Swiss-Prot record:
Organism classification: Bacteria, Pseudomonadati, Thermodesulfobacteriota, Desulfuromonadia, Geobacterales
Pfam families for this protein: Radical_SAM (PF04055)
Catalytic activity: [[Fe-S] cluster scaffold protein carrying a second [4Fe-4S](2+) cluster] + N(6)-octanoyl-L-lysyl-[protein] + 2 oxidized [2Fe-2S]-[ferredoxin] + 2 S-adenosyl-L-methionine + 4 H(+) = [[Fe-S] cluster scaffold protein] + N(6)-[(R)-dihydrolipoyl]-L-lysyl-[protein] + 4 Fe(3+) + 2 hydrogen sulfide + 2 5'-deoxyadenosine + 2 L-methionine + 2 reduced [2Fe-2S]-[ferredoxin]
Residues that, per the record, bind [4Fe-4S] cluster 1: C35, C40, C46, S273
Top EC class of this enzyme: transferase
Species in which this protein is naturally found: Geotalea daltonii (strain DSM 22248 / JCM 15807 / FRC-32)
Superkingdom per UniProt: Bacteria
Signal sequence coordinates: none
GO cellular component terms listed in the entry, alphabetical order: cytoplasm
Subcellular location as annotated: Cytoplasm
EC annotation from Swiss-Prot or TrEMBL: 2.8.1.8
Name this protein carries in UniProt: Lipoyl synthase
Cofactor(s) demanded: [4Fe-4S] cluster
Length: 294
């Protein structure tokens, strides 16, 4: 039976007091995070632990996806000093694992690939021990851009599939097959590189559609997977169609692991970079943290 009202397991509280220190640090370095721009429900938990997913290439997106809270406007010029500021934050926070992502920049010839590569280089120079994960857009299928981020040699290179083919109309300008081909190309260019993707549940997908998407991902040898609950940022966004139970997420995780994914995070509050440091640890999944009481 589908649940269409927000259930009790999705009542995690946000604590602004937990944000103050991190927001001062990020503001001082003129940096953005997807945690803030996407109104992530895990922001208090992650900021309390001094973790953040850095949003480079500005905070304005050129696409109009109906599920996303990132602002859609004509972006500003690329800030070439941004990689060094991200690296400074990584060093100050003493991060052992960092995730860097961006809005889609269809206005740029390379989609922002060069700045991704520069950011990897800056982090590696400032904090050589930090594991670097990139979560990149599709670069409009530009193979030179994909090759550029692969050549930067992040430890993990992610690109989110987001949903099943039937529902791809919610992804403005995106193409299901193009995203799969991108993940396949990454592995072809560097067979040792770990690829990662994420899907949102509750958009109206069927279980068989989800499992077919997982089979498609295994066919392109995708290594890591995240499955999380879609939560509409506002009433003007695409409405939630269903709230799968925590037990359903557990079952999906076991199904995905049985298909050959090396690590799967699956739960209502799972997001692409949630517990990112646990991928590749050999545990299969992390124990999810309880919702903070404050």
């Amino acid at each position: 039976m589908k649940i269409t009202r927000r259930p009790e397991w999705l009542q995690k509280k946000v604590s602004p007091a937990a944000h103050a220190d991190m927001e001062r640090l990020l503001g001082g370095l003129q940096l953005h995070t997807v945690c803030q721009e996407a109104h992530c429900p895990n922001i208090s938990e992650c900021f309390r632990q001094r973790q953040a997913t850095f949003l480079i290439l500005g905070k304005l997106c050129t696409r109009l996806c109906s599920f996303c809270n990132v602002t859609k406007q004509t972006p500003l010029a690329v800030d070439q000093a941004e990689p060094e500021r991200v690296a400074a934050a990584v060093e100050l926070l003493k991060l052992t694992h960092v995730v860097v992502t961006s809005p889609t920049r269809d206005d740029l010839a390379d989609g922002g690939a060069a700045l991704y590569a520069a950011t990897v280089a800056a982090i590696r120079n400032a904090s050589p021990q930090t594991k670097i994960e990139l979560l990149v857009p599709d670069f409009a299928g530009n193979q030179e851009s994909i090759a550029a981020v692969v050549s930067a040699c992040p430890h993990i290179l992610g690109h989110n599939l987001e949903t099943v083919p039937r529902l791809y109309s919610i992804r403005s300008g995106a193409d299901y097959r193009r995203s799969l081909l991108m993940l396949e190309m990454i592995r072809r260019l560097n067979p040792a590189m770990k690829t990662k993707t994420g899907l949102m549940l509750g958009l109206g997908e069927t279980e068989e559609e989800l499992f077919q998407a997982l089979r498609d991902l295994r066919r392109v040898d995708c290594s890591y997977l995240s499955l999380g609950q879609y939560l509409a940022p506002s009433r003007s966004h695409y409405p939630v169609q269903d709230y799968p139970s925590p037990e359903t997420f557990d079952r999906y995780r076991e199904q995905a692991l049985s298909m050959g994914f090396e690590h799967v995070e699956s739960g209502p509050y799972v997001r692409s970079s949630y517990h990112a440091e646990h991928y590749g640890t050999g545990t299969g999944h992390a124990k999810l943290s309880p919702a903070p009481a404050d």
